[in-house]
From Swiss-Prot:
EC number: 6.5.1.2
Ligand binding (Zn(2+)): C416, C419, C434, C439
Name of protein: DNA ligase
SMART domains in the record: BRCT, HhH1, LIGANc
Biological role stated in the UniProt entry: DNA ligase that catalyzes the formation of phosphodiester linkages between 5'-phosphoryl and 3'-hydroxyl groups in double-stranded DNA using NAD as a coenzyme and as the energy source for the reaction. It is essential for DNA replication and repair of damaged DNA.
Example of a GO biological process term: DNA repair
Source species, domain of life: Bacteria
CDD domains given in the database record: BRCT_DNA_ligase_like, LIGANc
Entry cofactors: Mg(2+); Mn(2+)
Amino acid sequence: MKKADASARARELRDRIRAADHAYYVLDQPLLADAEYDRLMHELQALEAEHPELVTADSPTQRVSGAPSERFERVVHREPMLSLGNVQSDDELHEFDARVRRLLGLPDGEPVGYVVEPKLDGLAVELVYRDGAFTSGSTRGDGVNGEDVTANLRVVGGLGANRGVPHALEGRPPPRVEVRGEVLLFKEHFEAMNRQLVRAGEEPFANPRNAAAGTLRQLDWRVTARRPLSFIAYEALLPGGDPWRTHWEKLEELAAWGFETNAENRRCRGLAEVLAYRDRMAERRFELPYDTDGIVVKVDDLDWRRRLGAASKFPRWAVAFKYPPQEEATRIRRIWASVGRTGVLTPVVDFDPVRLSGAMVARATLHNEDEMRRKDILEGDWVLVRRAGEVIPEVVKPLPERRTGAEQPFRFPAECPVCGARVVREEGEKVYRCTGAACPAQLVGRLCHFAQRRALDIEGLGEKLAAGLVERGQVKDFADLYAVPFEVWQQLFSRPRKEQDAGAARELPEKSAQNMVAALERSRKTTLRRFLFALGIPQVGEATAATLARHFGDLARVMDADEEALKGVRDVGPETAAEIRAWTQEPQNRRVVERLLAAGVTPEAEVVEARGPFAGKTVVLTGGLSTMSRDDAKAEIERRGGKVSGSVSRKTYLVVAGEDAGSKLEKARSLGVRIAGEEEFVRLLKE
């Protein structure tokens, strides 16, 4: 592959992986199947290995994914909570073992001692104990910064679901210890909880991982207390270093302090025993009381671990082996087209229900016509399906040997199944679109996009409430939301609970309506970048919205910018500039924006805090940072009134030197410019 093509492909892969990371770790809504995510990550790793110059400090291959949510206080982990590299074949496990042996300088034939355990599918957390008492707890977040969920962790296990988070340690614990482990829902508790939700007319959770993550990150700890979460410990860290010789001794100590450790943990001498354990667990995985999608292999000797160390993202002494997804055969009942907010018709497959990874599954999407044709999927086909990553239902392939001749290809409708408008597929596009400007399905999708957390954050306004507003003719555009009478909200919340949104409040209709009105009132005060993202302008995602907000500063300048001005914005190309200009000059869109402003929605520019050590100063970044991406560092400096430059001069205030800093560092030294390492830079940001 030519360097230019490799660079473009690497950039595309990084963007897709970052989007998937955000959806999985921050929103708790998986975007990609695990197998697809792993394929993209492996492709990016291979590209960067072949072209080392393409490696960027903020590449997903260089740091743990999952930035902490803005809803909780940020916590800095004393030691980073690194994620694990994953492998999917015997060859890769052999490579891991060989690498460990090579780095340790072990003679041929000397086996490595490992501890192996099931890979739990929950939420990784850290608990801090002082003098045996639980004092604080946080999520892993991005590995360096997590979220403070102390109040919620205090009630994990409060229903007696299993051994939870001890408030006080047993035996003789050290003065301070950090305990790491997984918060999860056992299968029986998950199923019981979902039965209760269904009986109450509420939406059940899709899987135990989403349920555990969503429960632990509730703002109200009482919600967490009502759900049967469990905690399983697998790591302990002492400020002065490990007093234990092996990881196994550490696990025994954790049990002595009162923690639940995994009963399936085993010690193995050499890789052959690891492989035998892997095979046994693969056979038993669906019999276990919790969801698991693989095993974790860890070097047992703690001195060896210290010698092996860690790369920027993964420890060198551990790896996760992931099982291939479970697949089952079933028969397609029908294929139909759903309509999204942009008018795109997506083929949806309904099939006979099958149990996959402990859950009943009966529906999957096929993305577009090309994928359906490539997979050769026909209505009436027998197909193999799986829950890729144990989460997202996916049609893998048809079973043509079981065809009877009655199967038929699916044809996209000529008219929209919702509004009856003409459906078209433009030349060069992969998707069919509804051309109806007033299509109710598109309007519902746009309203949900407008109300989502990353846009105007109208809490409780989901698809079913939006559909109710559209059905009543109450809302025809975003601005109408702010004119919905209180009694209409009451009527919507008076419907049977099974018809309400899963995320909506579960109080009396009047209280729920009051909450919705309050959420709408809060949404009136927003930032320019959130507002621009909420409008759903074609090709304007969060990143582009933020760039436009920073470049233009106020809404009027964005709305009046011509194509040339838009092309002058960083990362906005000709196609995106044309799309933005076309949208802003459409009279109906301008009327909606004017009505939103008249309704009291005030999109304010980002406030620049022109104070502190960076105010009015020029800063240069060089090398990779482990605690944040280069873009994040740049944004933090600019938010404090500083300017980030790409070159060093005598006017440069500070050069921030990360890992593998290059020629800019040498030039700074020659000019006598102040140099700060990452630790000092983070400290300066806090001043």
